[in-house]
Amino acid sequence: NNSSRSVEQYVKKLEKMGIPAAENDVLLSTHDCIAWLNRNNVNETYCVGTEGMRQMLEAEGISTRSTQPQYVVLGYDTETTYERLEKASLHLHAGVPLMASHPDMVCPSPDGGLPDVGAFLALFKATTGVEATHISGKPNPGMILHKIEELGLKPEECAMVGDRLYTDIAMANRANCM
């Protein structure tokens, strides 16, 4: 559910760890976000997300810095600025709907939890009164079902291993995986 890096960045990270990987081996909540935006014909957004996330959206023809966005898109933005949050808030006050890449409240770190997308969703609700109309990523079963189909498998032939019951295991249950 981490949308802070692009697929290319994750492949490089895995390779540095000695794990060979190709881009099609990596599945991110950003993929689910892009699929949802495309299904809903959204190509003008204001994205609160990292450069890696914005590059993935832009590569799919989705503008991420529109002055007249169809949606404010919220990802795990480890590079955010007050100005970015302010612009997103103003769009939300103007009636632009909000969608998010995933619901996680906390991103674990060795030194303690860090604010993740869910925490920023709470911030926007508190400051603008706006709640997300859609949240992509886990626990949405669509996050994994398209990959299962692409691999020619059935959900009941797949098992999920994860560290969070409310995202990883909930998604597996909703997708009818083991």
Question: What kind of region is each of these model predictions?
Answer:
Residues 1-178:
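HAD-like aspartate-dependent phosphatase fold
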